[in-house]
Amino acid sequence: TSIDDGDHPEHEDFRHGTHLAGAVICDLFDGIEGRGVASSSQLIFQDVVNESGWSEPEIDWLLAEDLAYGAVIHSYSWGDVTEAYTSRSFLLDAWHREVPWSLAFIAPGNNPSKLYEPANARNIVSVGGTMKDNGTDLYTGSSHGPTEEGLRGNFIVTPAVGIVSAAADGNLSSFNSDMRSST
């Protein structure tokens, strides 16, 4: 899915999805060290940022597209800055009741005392971040909740600082193989 023609260097969220996708599925290339947590997996890339900002389609539309291509694991690192249980949270919960063999991993945001939607859905895995050199300390910007209802926040945490992963260059025909380090 693409709402436009790819990453736009003019937007502040340029490269975000590419970097996260690389952290999940990257494999070694031309001697570059690094491997994603599910290296050699296949990817359905759903571009939800255009030159004006976020413009994501309805979550049920994205999930239906995933199902049509056989994807059962979902990774979302976006949402709205609200702790409310939204229609998107509800649709994710409904989806996972109807398609119980699928699972979504969702970043809860960048405010430690909050847990933003859709990571507050009840049938997903909320993923917080730790410092890279010490897996027991949460990254200072990692959301962890609790939820608006007072429920626990993250299900799991993963290193979130200094991650070397894929780098977008904004050129659709470059066959870019660059890497970058980021949070």
Predicted feature residues:
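Amphipathic alpha-helical segments in well-structured domains
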Residues: G17, I59-D60, R88-L92, L138
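Short acidic, glycine-rich surface-loop motifs adjacent to enzyme active sites
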Residues: L63-S89, I106-P108
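Subtilisin-like serine protease catalytic core
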Residues: T1-E56, V72, T82-Y85, V99-W101, ...
